[in-house]
């Protein structure tokens, strides 16, 4: 579980990341589709799956809006993300293993875009947070 220090570190890092959230999200989604091609199945309705395509950028923005919500609900992720969990489980039918894949891609992008801020401590805290988000999003699958 997230400690108070983890939460404070995530909130501080998010304060910097949020200014570039759309770019982070687009890069993370684009990276996921390229590095983990099995994830393309969820986006087969898009005419263009290239990393810089408008659909990838739009979905990246959507993902980061969800992360912003998670940061705001950091004290109760399970209830705070319940609606998103239901949407992913019942409407989109996303395999919850993909949450971890996208989380990893986000960590890579954030490390690349924010090397000064992405300290080992920040890395651990953000990784724990994204794991907690993945778990909360998996809630309705049970």
UniProtKB/Swiss-Prot annotation:
Which InterPro entries does the record associate with it? Answer: Globin, Globin-like_sf, Globin/Proto, Hemoglobin_a-typ, Hemoglobin_oxygen_transport, Hemoglobin_pi
Which UniProt keywords are given for this protein, alphabetically ordered?
Acetylation, Heme, Iron, Metal-binding, Oxygen transport, Transport
- Annotated binding of O2, by residue: 59
**Tissues with expression:** Red blood cells.
Q: Which GO terms describe its biological process?
A: hydrogen peroxide catabolic process; oxygen transport
What name is this protein filed under?
A: Hemoglobin subunit alpha
Sites of N-acetylserine modification: 1
- Residues engaged in binding heme b: 88
Cellular component, GO, one term: blood microparticle
Question: A Gene Ontology molecular-function term?
Answer: oxygen carrier activity
- Keyword Transport annotated: yes
Q: Which Gene3D superfamilies match?
A: Globins (1.10.490.10)
The record's annotation in Pfam families points to:
Globin
Which residues belong to any copy of the Globin domain?
1-142
How the protein assembles, per its UniProt entry? Hb1 is a heterotetramer of two alpha chains and two beta-1 chains. Hb2 is a heterotetramer of two alpha chains and two beta-2 chains.
Q: Tell me which family the UniProt entry assigns to this protein.
A: Belongs to the globin family.
What is this protein's function per UniProt?
A: Involved in oxygen transport from gills to the various peripheral tissues.
PANTHER family given in the database record: HEMOGLOBIN FAMILY MEMBER (PTHR11442), HEMOGLOBIN SUBUNIT ZETA (PTHR11442:SF41)
- Heme as a keyword? yes
């Amino acid at each position: 579980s997230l400690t108070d220090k983890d939460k404070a570190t995530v909130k501080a890092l998010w304060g910097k990341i949020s200014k570039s959230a759309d770019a982070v999200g687009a890069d993370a989604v684009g990276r996921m589709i390229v590095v983990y091609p099995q994830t393309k199945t969820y986006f087969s309705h898009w005419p263009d799956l290239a990393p810089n395509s408008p659909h990838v950028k739009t979905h990246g923005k959507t993902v980061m809006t969800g992360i912003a919500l998670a940061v705001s609900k950091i004290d109760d992720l399970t209830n705070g993300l319940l609606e998103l969990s239901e949407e992913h489980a019942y409407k989109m039918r996303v395999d919850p293993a993909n949450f971890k894949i996208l989380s990893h891609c986000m960590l890579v992008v954030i490390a690349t875009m924010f090397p000064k801020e992405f300290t080992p401590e920040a890395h651990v805290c953000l990784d724990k947070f994204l794991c907690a988000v993945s778990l909360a999003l998996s809630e309705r699958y049970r």
